[in-house]
Amino acid sequence: MNKVASVILSVLVLICLSCTEKREMTLAQYRNYIEAKGGGFCKTVTAGPLIYTVQYRPPLYIAAAEHKWQFNDSTEMKTRTMALGGIVWFNVRIGTVSGATNPLKSDVSGVAEYNDRLNYWLTQAANHFTLYYGDLELKPQGYVFENSYGLISEDVVVIGFRLPDTTPVRPLRLEYEDQLYNTGIIKAEISMDVLQELDHIQVKI
């Protein structure tokens, strides 16, 4: 084997090792990593007077949140995480650009309009969310609107979609066609490169 071929082979071996090497994190570090603003798992879209923050919630993230970010052991963590496979979940936070007013109350003309807005989020909005997964168009399997009752300046939609795969093997593009504030179609994509990063993270208990 000549020197050039030997160097190329060495570089390829190093690349393979770096691809398979696990990045260790504590649960707190993992939470910060997933929630990082501007990171690959949290997308912010500004549309007119509103801000939509789309947070992808991997199974481990959900399992840890259920256990208040503290597991008894790794078996408990793995068991619950595996049970959550096959459905992808997002939190969609809806706030105003000013941050001074809750979207349900922003420029509302009165109680009747407020109730119409609330009814829309409770009973209709789920029909206007679509997850594009490769060539598939998926509609929600789970939907909850968490009403803050105007106590804070944002409300939250929790929405889930069942995949044909246990874990995503294609990019995830969430779209919401706004029928309430006329802000158009809101899009947020989690790329395959970002999703594959999860395979190289090892959380320590």
Residue ranges of each PLM-predicted region?
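Conserved functional micro-motifs across diverse proteins
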Residues: 19-156, 160-205
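Sec-dependent bacterial lipoprotein signal peptides
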Residues: 1-19
